[in-house]
From Swiss-Prot:
It comes from Borrelia duttonii (strain Ly). Can catalyze the hydrolysis of ATP in the presence of single-stranded DNA, the ATP-dependent uptake of single-stranded DNA by duplex DNA, and the ATP-dependent hybridization of homologous single-stranded DNAs. It interacts with LexA causing its activation and leading to its autocatalytic cleavage. Belongs to the RecA family. CDD domains: RecA (cd00983). One of its GO terms (molecular function) is single-stranded DNA binding. It comes from the Bacteria. It is found in: Cytoplasm. The gene is recA. ATP binds at G79, P80, E81, S82, S83, G84, K85, T86. PANTHER family: MITOCHONDRIAL DNA REPAIR PROTEIN RECA HOMOLOG-RELATED, RECA. GO terms for biological process: DNA recombination; DNA repair; SOS response. Pfam families: RecA, RecA_C. This is Protein RecA. Coiled coil: none annotated.
Amino acid sequence: MSKLKDPMDDSLKNKLNKEKAIELARVQIEKDFGKGSLIKMGESPVGKYLESIPSGSILLDEAIGIGGYPRGRVVEIFGPESSGKTTLTLQAIAEIQKTGGIAAFIDAEHALDPVYARALGVNINELWLSQPDTGEQALDIAEYLIRSGGVDLIVVDSVAALTPQAEIDGEMGDTQIGLQARLMSKALRKITAILSKSNTCIMFINQIRMKIGLVFGSPETTTGGNALKFYSSLRLEVRKVEQVIGSSSDNVIGNKIRVKVVKNKVAPPFRKAELIVYFGKGISREASILDAAIKYNLVQKSGSWYAMGDDNLGQGRENVIEYLFKEKALANELENKLRKIIFESPSQDSLTVDISKSEENKE
């Protein structure tokens, strides 16, 4: 009686033949295009956890999902005027500088306030600044900085101010359609190819415009065409929610802003974070810590009183925030505990996932 052939033997032989064939292809690819042109995903940085740049608020870090802004990716921050967009980017610059990182600010609007930047914790003596004349110049500078591999964070303020050379050379009444959109599309094609290798995060601040004659759907859109929407791994929408009132009813000391993650390729999208931004001081780290501590039951609230276990922290939210601001050690202890709770046990949600076109899918 003849012995039956084990189908597993054929399967194993087939797999070995395929592996041998792809190894020959890999050798030829590396010969033509250089070492590392084709590798298994687990051997590359793409297959590992993404590094991130802290935002300055643990609530926003949680909403983004990976503990901050992703390195090696494009980030877009957009919203109405005076909603806190530039504040978010300056806070990120301050955070990366604290770890010894290098940041650059491409000020296409020519409106960066060094006094305000310093108040937010930015070391302006170490911040690289460019105030380009044209959009092409701004994006070329960004490309050079990324290729250098020496810059951790680049901020472009703003997309709306990236004026194409042809528009500057033309007359005021000239009609030039799609110049800025084509400029952004070409620049982003070049930039994204080199971003991941340099591990640089580039953040674009963008403004909102209104669509004319729209009957259904939101009339709001962002400037610069659709390229930035597609190439961005993270898109944050910033809105002012309400004013923060001080000791008297007519004393406005800041704003509460809501940051919504409308697109996220590195974690689940559509999360929100509400932050307190004080005038002249920036994002309140202590307010974010307090809100997160209440959320995760590290701090208990009873009426207007706040306690941490058996220890009373104070009465009234603003008083407790002020107390945490003075007691740096306690604030740091709370933040470290929160980061362990939120980020230290990686789940499938915190892995690098490609949720492409998340914003478009929602629509």
